[in-house]
Structures are given as C-alpha cells and as structure tokens.
C-alpha cells in the first residue's frame, strides 16, 4: 500500500513536457458552500444518472422494474456548522453514487503532487461498501476501494479524506479533459454524506491506495463489501474440508483453483462434477470475486497445505479485468506468481492452466479483448510437462465468436450446460495428465 505513487511513467513524461512548466492552479473546487452552476451534481444508479437540481432526487422509478426492492436517494443537507453537504442513501443495490460532473478539466498539472480531498460522514455502512472514483479520459475511470476505512468511520462524525491524485493514474491515461473528476459510489446498503470536495495542487494524503503495478502479485484477502461476511469463513471451511478428506484417506487427487466460475462447480455445475470428478475425490477451491492476489493469499495461508493431488486446474484473472481493469501484463504477472506458489507447495503436482473464459456477447467487447490479450501470453508460462496450457474457449462460442446466454446466462458464468461443455472439452487433456506417472 502507498500514500502516494512515485515515478509513474505518465507523470514523468508529463513533467518533462513543456506543458508542465507552468505551475498548476491552487485547486479545483468541485463542491462547497458556494453555488457552482458549472458543476452538475448527479445521483448514480446501475444504468442511469439523475441530476440533482432541487433539494433531492431519487432513482427509484428507474430501479422499479429491474430492482424492485432497491432505492437510491441523493439530497442536499448541512454540516453542523451550517456548511453545505450532500447525503446519499441507498438500499440493496450493487451500484449507487454521487458524482460531480464538469466541463472538461485538465488535471495533468495535479498528478505529480496533487490530492483529492473531501469531508465524509458515514452514518450506515454495515451492509455496504464505498469506492472513490476519478475520470481518466474518454470511457476511462480509476477507483480506490474504501470499504474497510468506510466501515471504520461509521458513526464517528465528519472526517477529512485526502487521497493522492496519483492513486487514480496509470500509464497511458489521459487526464487532459476529465469531465467527472469525482464520484463516490456505494454498494449494498448505506448512508453517507460528503462536503468540501476539491482537487488541490498539494496536500498530505491520509488514505492509502494500492500500487496498480504490484497489486495483482501482492497477497490480499478479498475485502469487498459483498465478500467480507463469507470469504474468510469459506477459506477456513475449505481448510477443514481438505483436512477431513486426508484423515479419511480420501486425499484429493484433483484440485480446482479459481474464482466464481470454479466455485460454480458446487452449484450449477454440481451434476457434471459428480459425473466427471467425484471419482478423483476432487476438491473445489473456487471463490467468487477472487483476483490473482486473493488466490495467492489463500495459497500462502494453507489452501493446499498437506495435499498431494495429481493435477491442479487453475483458471484465474477475469475479475482482474472486470472488477479493476488491470492491464493484461499485470494479470499475467499475477497468474505467474500463483503458478510459482502452487509449484512450491505441491511439488509432485502437474498444473493444468486453463485460458480465461470468454465473457460478454461479442468479440468486440473490451473486457473480452483484455482477457484474450491475457490468454495470448499464457502459453509462455507452460513447459508442457509440469505446467500445461489448455484453451477450451472455442467450445463456448459460435463460429462468429458470439457467446450465447443458453450456456452462460449472464455472459460470464456457465450454467449446467456450460459446465458440461467445459468438462467435455477439458477431458482428453485432463485424463492424459491424471494417467501420467508422478513427478
């Protein structure tokens, strides 16, 4: 973790340019006691935005059809000293938020030493989470999770949050025309208030952020609002399940390691699992939402200790793409780090490295393209003996590359038919590896 990022290539290149010779303005004030007609205040919903022109605005009508039990409200409020504030309330929704939208802002002068600061009061966040976002060019935004510090701030009144603006910058981002320089998004259920939002040329950050260059290879628990309650208990339950299997002389000969797609073998894929893998006393170590660093944390905290499977099937990385927008090289580095960890902890086990599955309907999907860029680099991680790479993605797609909802209803997770396709496509290589002599 870091309080400020240093030596980012994009910052260095900018500071060496002529545009950096002029001192940045002292601050870009986005919200305070002064009316700012050039700043639009927006309430965010999953598929819509709603401008706050009066005292409050809700997204309830837009939510009614798809999310009938959900609610989002953004209202003007006051701080104890009478200063202007905004209060966001949301209930049972995966995305809500307050955003400040402006004419294009050139934030490049602020990247090297600038900060984003705002006052925050958390009234309720037991069942929710927060995320701070800053735009970084057309169709680009970067985020800093604020789940744990947000919950820690609950009931403690107003607090000043100061983040290094470099927390939101990656190589290649374009901060020359940012139209949404601030958003605070909520998930689950909660209530928070904000005030005095500004981007300053200086300041001392008081809130840490992960380094985008190393986050995928740095072991971490999955501390999302929707995972905190179950993720660590599931890890402990899986440790106990593995120990019990070993005690009963049914040590797993096959282990699957991955994210929700792997965890789905316990749900939609359960009938297929029983047909193909129960005979190997197979163990499912899939955890919904996991990114490469979360799998790495589990491996380093006992996930496969004491086991000696013939084969471990590893597929991970689609959440690096979908939840955080990692560069392909970062995700590949995380996969490589997990392979090294598995090799160290399971020295007699062969690893079947499976290409990340296709997602979204068409080949033009940006997220699918990122996954394909990752997959293109994975064969280099395999030696054909200890680590074998397998790409079964063609089995899921029509000839023109379309992914059908008949096998992945949400265009990401297989249903039972999708798991049957996976098992059939993987079976020849898996059977071959299971039949080989031990390393």
What are these regions (language model features)?
Residues 7-18:
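Bacterial N-terminal signal peptides
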Residues 22-24, 198-257, 261-268, 433-439:
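N-terminal secretory targeting modules
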Residues 23-69, 206-212:
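Extracellular carbohydrate-recognition regions
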Residues 70-97:
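Short carbohydrate-recognition loop motifs
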Residues 90-171, 188-193, 198:
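Extracellular ligand-binding interfaces
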Residues 182-188:
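Short beta-strand-plus-loop segments that form exposed binding edges in beta-rich domains
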Residues 263-278, 292-336, 341, 352, ...:
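Oxyanion-hole/transition-state-stabilizing segment in secreted/luminal serine hydrolases
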Residues 358-439:
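Catalytic His-Asp segment of secreted/periplasmic serine-dependent ester chemistry enzymes
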